[in-house]
Regions:
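A beta-strand edge to alpha-helix "cap/lid" segment located at domain peripheries
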Residues: 1-15, 19-23, 28-116
């Protein structure tokens, strides 16, 4: 199930759909991407201009799991749709933590690191 939620999160970013992204990501989530830290709400505002044309998740693994939290790690390969978004393209290690709040799973932490 968390794998599907991660895919939905990436798909909403690809589609520039900040409303769908905000449904999946807690407003106060900690997002650390490309050396930049922001909240889930701040990151959702960036999604409409995210600028990736494709993504592929591989190596998905559950690192830790309880009834209330799940931490995952995977590799995502992204493609940028225009040259000015080239810094968004590449291969990244990603770790995310999801929390079950009142029966709904929401992302509360996400961090990526470019694979060199």
């Amino acid at each position: 199930m968390i794998y599907q939620l991660e895919n939905k999160m990436w798909q909403s970013a690809k589609d520039g759909d900040k409303t769908e992204f905000a449904k999946l990501v807690s407003a106060d989530a900690v997002m650390v991407c490309g050396g930049y830290r922001c909240t889930g709400a701040e990151y959702a505002e960036l999604v409409s201009d995210f600028g990736i044309s494709d993504f592929e998740i591989t190596g998905f693994e559950i690192v830790h799991e309880t009834d209330k939290t799940v931490q995952v790690h995977y590799i995502v390969k992204t493609t940028a749709d225009v040259p000015e978004n080239a810094d968004l393209a590449g291969t990244f290690h990603v770790t995310s933590t999801w929390k079950n709040l009142n029966g709904e799973w929401v992302l509360v932490f996400n961090m990526d690191s470019r694979v060199l």
